[in-house]
Amino acid sequence: GVEIRIEDSGEVLYRSPGVFQKYFKNPEATAETKTSDRWVRTGDAGYFDDEGHLRIIDRAKDVGKLNDDSMFAPKFLENKLKFYPEIQEAVTFGDGRDFVTAFINIDLDAVANWAERNNVAYASYQELAANPKVYDLIQDCVEKVNRSIAEDAYLATSQIRRFLVLHKELDPDDGELTRTRKVRRRIINERYSDLIEALF
């Protein structure tokens, strides 16, 4: 059989009689991947739900902790937000904090379509993103995500308490996203540090 264990960091480890012994001529990689008592590090973070099922939620290197020591999985939250067509991009903050906050980029096509159907006039992305009705639209998405997270005892503390609809789209040309549209957290933390602090 296979044994599974969750470390305090949230990383999932497993071991079984069929696990490889070591990497060929690479003791460093073996030491990084296997513990001295034969557990294999998956690099994934997860937990066992109430029914005993293993749930993988993020890469272990990306998971942090809120000040109450509960798990904070930014990509998990961001993907839940981006499920809504009105949200193009989301960046969540909470590691070492008392609660979770988020930056949100609206999806211009989806929100412009919504604006047209709801007689909301705008002349630019900035104007649309700043519209109070658009804020309410995004707040509805955030509240739905929070309700979903609240149902999960393990992640309930990661509900998004505050958010900001950014006035500009995060852009690979500005170094805020990679070319494959992955968030560059370090750059965003540096560039928007004042806005991040204002959310807390």
Question: Where are each of the predicted segments found?
Answer:
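Acidic-enriched catalytic cores of C-N bond-cleaving enzymes acting on peptides and small amides
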Residues: 124-141, 148
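C-terminal boundary motif of the adenylate-forming
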Residues: 45, 84-110, 149-152
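Conserved C-terminal "lid"/linker of ANL adenylate-forming enzymes
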Residues: 89, 139, 145-200
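Residue-level signal for inorganic ion chemistry
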Residues: 4, 52, 81, 102
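Phosphate/diphosphate-binding loops
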Residues: 1-4, 76
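Conserved ATP-binding/catalytic segment of the ANL
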Residues: 5-66
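Short Gly/Ser/Thr- and Asp/Glu-enriched loop/turn motifs at secondary-structure junctions
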Residues: 59, 95-99, 157-161
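Adenylate-forming
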Residues: 19, 53-82, 112-132, 156-157, ...
